[in-house]
Amino acid sequence: MSDVLTRICDDKRALVQARKSARPLSAVEDDARSADPAGGFIRALRRTVDGGRYGLIAEIKKASPSKGLIRPDFDPPSLARAYRGGGATCLSVLTDEPYFQGCDDYLLSARAAVDLPVLRKDFMVDPYQIAESRALGADCILIIMAALSDAQAVEIEDAAIAWGLDVLVEVHNREELDRALALKTPLLGVNNRNLKTLAVDIATTEELAAHVPADRMLVAESGLYSPADLSRMAAVGARCFLVGESLMRQEDVSAATRALLA
């Protein structure tokens, strides 16, 4: 890790420690046990792809370190409904506050607004966050290989499995991809954004796709703006896509989502 990602993860560890002090793990686990069952994030994507359509993970994101404020009129329930109306298969909701202006309530309100499975998009550095994610109603969590050691990634994934959560493991280069393949999850995302520099190049997915085994579901992430971009990614085997900023900037999010998937 270096630069942006290191800073984010260092801050996240400090935040998690503060949350642990404010609310012990046992209390969070009680909430997680009383939450509605997880909704089958991977199952929904498989069903969509098997039906001959692209599986879109549509992201609810207010801001980012690279672009600042993305959508001033930010209402997660309305956005969730717009994405669902536009044909999204799943949602991704940013809950990181310091860098993305997210919060837990955004996930709660989006989850309550629609019946789509939801990914908690955050920087997972501690198993405490996994129980927290289940308590919030998340169906899937993110593992960023650039942010974790192999042992930490396994620990986070094992915690997710124990809580019935699916896992999207994210990589940006061949070394991270090889490490990610040691995990159990079939859902493998290639982030076209380098989280250390924030630079974007959609050729990243093209370069790594050939090394993704056939039993993994390839998800192309970041830098996708048009049906042509999705077709370019599909040509190398991606049938699932995580798209946020390009849709969040549109006045009519539902229409933009339909157009992207056309």
Swiss-Prot record:
<dbReference type="GO" id="GO:0004640">
    <property type="term" value="F:phosphoribosylanthranilate isomerase activity"/>
</dbReference>
<keyword id="KW-0456">Lyase</keyword>
<keyword id="KW-0057">Aromatic amino acid biosynthesis</keyword>
<keyword id="KW-0028">Amino-acid biosynthesis</keyword>
<dbReference type="InterPro" id="IPR013798">
    <property type="entry name" value="Indole-3-glycerol_P_synth_dom"/>
</dbReference>
<keyword id="KW-0822">Tryptophan biosynthesis</keyword>
<protein>
    <recommendedName>
        <fullName>Indole-3-glycerol phosphate synthase</fullName>
        <ecNumber>4.1.1.48</ecNumber>
    </recommendedName>
</protein>
<dbReference type="InterPro" id="IPR001468">
    <property type="entry name" value="Indole-3-GlycerolPSynthase_CS"/>
</dbReference>
<dbReference type="InterPro" id="IPR011060">
    <property type="entry name" value="RibuloseP-bd_barrel"/>
</dbReference>
<comment type="function">
    <text>Participates in the tryptophan-dependent indole-3-acetic acid production, which is a phytohormone released by A.brasilense.</text>
</comment>
<dbReference type="InterPro" id="IPR013785">
    <property type="entry name" value="Aldolase_TIM"/>
</dbReference>
<keyword id="KW-0210">Decarboxylase</keyword>
<dbReference type="GO" id="GO:0000162">
    <property type="term" value="P:L-tryptophan biosynthetic process"/>
</dbReference>
<comment type="similarity">
    <text>Belongs to the TrpC family.</text>
</comment>
<dbReference type="Pfam" id="PF00218">
    <property type="entry name" value="IGPS"/>
</dbReference>
<dbReference type="InterPro" id="IPR045186">
    <property type="entry name" value="Indole-3-glycerol_P_synth"/>
</dbReference>
<comment type="pathway">
    <text>Amino-acid biosynthesis; L-tryptophan biosynthesis; L-tryptophan from chorismate: step 4/5.</text>
</comment>
<dbReference type="GO" id="GO:0004425">
    <property type="term" value="F:indole-3-glycerol-phosphate synthase activity"/>
</dbReference>
